[in-house]
């Protein structure tokens, strides 16, 4: 007679709660370390700063706010945090989610109400991406509010992978080596923008947001109509990372390791003076091409 065996244990069962907690603690510690390092490296926060944390309801901005709150508890300098959200009047936007969450954690906050949705959908031709105009209008509204409230810094939730993707978008589509700096002054000179997640990977943010169970709000305006160029760059980067793990981190490090003399930007390095052995003025391009130019104009 065949023996009767108990059912086999599911070897793919979820990890034990203790192990999950340990992994989550390690992840939170890594993120705090990376955010703290970025703040220190780029001088993002100083004593008595009044920081406006831009909260969209996405994983990145939730993680940004959470990290800043954790770091502030033991920070070497005092600073204030206020969460600010722009209600763009998108149809179906759950207006209650952010205020309820922020109130539950005792976070000072303000909701700016401005109908940019109607403007963007009216102005942008059908079939075109809405991202560019939407971003400009959102930025304008946030900057205006920051100015009226006297905020000294504006914190955004862009992370390491965003910065790398922006670099390649500018390289591929605009023929320039520029990106998304961890800290910058706005074009009008009135605001200092900081990106404390500059060293944090998107993979870690996804894992952290999932562990913390943030009430994520999808963007109905552009979430389903992702910017095509950024999406294409994202596909390339993910393929590189899959084939060569650590590739994105290496690229991110390269953004802070520039060698102007080994590029070709004449405004950053004086190639004219390199190796000169006299003070005689150098002939310009017109002089060097005089023969060709003469031939071009010949009958």
Curated annotation (Swiss-Prot):
Keywords: 4Fe-4S, ATP-binding, Cytoplasm, Iron, Iron-sulfur, Magnesium, Metal-binding, Nucleotide-binding, RNA-binding, Transferase, tRNA processing, tRNA-binding. Disulfide bonds: none annotated. CDD domains: TtcA-like (cd24138). Binds 1 [4Fe-4S] cluster per subunit. The cluster is chelated by three Cys residues, the fourth Fe has a free coordination site that may bind a sulfur atom transferred from the persulfide of IscS. One of its GO terms (biological process) is tRNA thio-modification. [4Fe-4S] cluster binds at residues 131, 134, 222. Its cofactor is Mg(2+); [4Fe-4S] cluster. It comes from the Bacteria. It catalyses: cytidine(32) in tRNA + S-sulfanyl-L-cysteinyl-[cysteine desulfurase] + AH2 + ATP = 2-thiocytidine(32) in tRNA + L-cysteinyl-[cysteine desulfurase] + A + AMP + diphosphate + H(+). Pfam families: ATP_bind_3. One of its GO terms (cellular component) is cytoplasm. It is found in: Cytoplasm. A motif (PP-loop motif) lies at residues 56-61. The keyword Cell membrane does not apply. It is an enzyme of class 2 (transferase). Its EC number is 2.8.1.-. Pathway: tRNA modification. Catalyzes the ATP-dependent 2-thiolation of cytidine in position 32 of tRNA, to form 2-thiocytidine (s(2)C32). The sulfur atoms are provided by the cysteine/cysteine desulfurase (IscS) system. PANTHER family: AMINOTRAN_5 DOMAIN-CONTAINING PROTEIN, SULFURTRANSFERASE-RELATED. NCBIfam families: PRK10696.1. The thiolation reaction likely consists of two steps: a first activation step by ATP to form an adenylated intermediate of the target base of tRNA, and a second nucleophilic substitution step of the sulfur (S) atom supplied by the hydrosulfide attached to the Fe-S cluster. Homodimer. This is tRNA-cytidine(32) 2-sulfurtransferase. It comes from Xylella fastidiosa (strain 9a5c). The gene is ttcA.
